[in-house]
Design a protein with these regions (language model features):
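Short, charged/polar, low-complexity loop and linker segments
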Residues: 35-42
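Amphipathic alpha-helical interaction surfaces
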Residues: 23, 60-68, 88, 92-96
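Intrinsic-disorder-associated interaction segments
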Residues: 2-6, 10, 14, 51, ...
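Short terminal alpha-helical segments
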Residues: 1-35
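Generic intrinsically disordered, low-complexity segments enriched for polar/acidic and small residues
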Residues: 6, 22-27, 46-47, 59-62, ...
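Amphipathic protein-protein interaction modules
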Residues: 42-81
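Amphipathic alpha-helical binding modules
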Residues: 71-98
Length: 98
């Protein structure tokens, strides 16, 4: 794997989130599952709890995509880039729970 392939992967992640956020919410059932989790766990900060769940699931999604594409685990630097992309969508994610 070279730097161009990694750049392409990172761009694919950006495109996936920006073009498919609604689909990701539907596919993973973020809102439906959140309603069940908050009843059982009863978090003090519901918004942070929701964001953490979404970020965790998307992080796992892209780590698995990376592994399937390159047949190696994602390195920390690329993972940080992916998490920064996910973090940039937190304002949109917050609106979903409001």
């Amino acid at each position: 794997m070279n730097s161009k392939e990694i750049e392409t992967f990172i761009q694919d992640v950006r495109d996936d989130i920006s073009n498919n956020l609604e689909g990701l919410f539907s596919y993973y059932g973020f809102l439906e599952n959140h309603n069940i989790r908050k009843i059982v766990i009863n978090p003090n900060d519901e918004l942070s709890f929701f964001e953490g769940t979404v970020v965790g699931m998307l992080d796992q999604r892209y780590c698995e995509f990376f592994r399937s594409k390159f047949n190696v685990d994602i390195d920390e630097i690329v993972r940080i880039d992916i998490l920064e992309i996910i973090k940039s969508y937190l304002p949109v994610i917050r609106k979903k729970i409001s």
